[in-house]
């Protein structure tokens, strides 16, 4: 069945069963980390943010949210692909992309999601990244894991 995870008073989602939950710190910001049960590979990371448009900017919060989603899919980055930005029936925005990286000799594939909505005059966003070794990308167990994560993220509730 999984377990409900709430993060930073911004997002709630259902983590698949058996996943380990931890917190890392990156540049002074807490990062939720979630690891699938063995033998599955990879790590899901989560950060959140709330962006209030500048009062003198004149653009509505919904425009700010759309701009964040479009920047999230990295249109200028040649490493990114499979970019989409969609709206859910509840008004939330979902942006998705995939990126291949090579850091310190480690080839990795990163699946990226942003779920955001207008909440209390701000653009509230949850940004998820699932990283796995590139050689595991396409493996049947990884495809199953990705399917579960995708379902959980697409149905995440922005608070």
Whereabouts are the PLM-identified features?
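Secretory pathway targeting signatures of secreted, lumenal, and periplasmic proteins
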Residues: 2-71, 104-106
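Structural motif
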Residues: 11-14, 120, 144, 148
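Short glycine-aromatic motifs
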Residues: 18-20, 91-93, 156
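Short amphipathic beta-strand/extended segments with alternating polar/hydrophobic composition
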Residues: 44-47, 110-114, 128
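Signature of long, low-cysteine stretches enriched in small and polar/charged residues
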Residues: 66-120
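Short hydrophobic/glycine-rich mini-motifs in sensory/regulatory modules
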Residues: 120-127
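Surface-exposed amphipathic alpha-helical segments
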Residues: 127-159
């Amino acid at each position: 069945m999984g377990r409900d995870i709430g993060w930073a008073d911004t997002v709630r989602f259902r983590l698949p069963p058996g996943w380990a939950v931890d917190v890392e710190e990156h540049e002074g910001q807490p990062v939720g980390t979630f690891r699938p049960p063995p033998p599955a590979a990879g790590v899901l990371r989560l950060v959140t943010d709330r962006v209030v448009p500048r009062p003198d900017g004149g653009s509505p919060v919904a425009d700010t949210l759309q701009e964040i989603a479009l920047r999230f899919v990295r249109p200028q980055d040649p490493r990114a692909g499979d970019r989409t930005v969609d709206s859910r029936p509840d008004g939330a925005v979902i942006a998705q992309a995939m990126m291949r990286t090579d850091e310190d000799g480690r080839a990795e594939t990163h699946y990226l999601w942003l779920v955001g909505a207008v909440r209390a005059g701000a653009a509230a966003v949850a940004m998820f990244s699932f990283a796995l070794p590139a050689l595991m990308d396409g493996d049947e167990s990884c495809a199953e894991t990705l399917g579960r994560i995708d379902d959980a993220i697409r149905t995440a509730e922005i608070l």
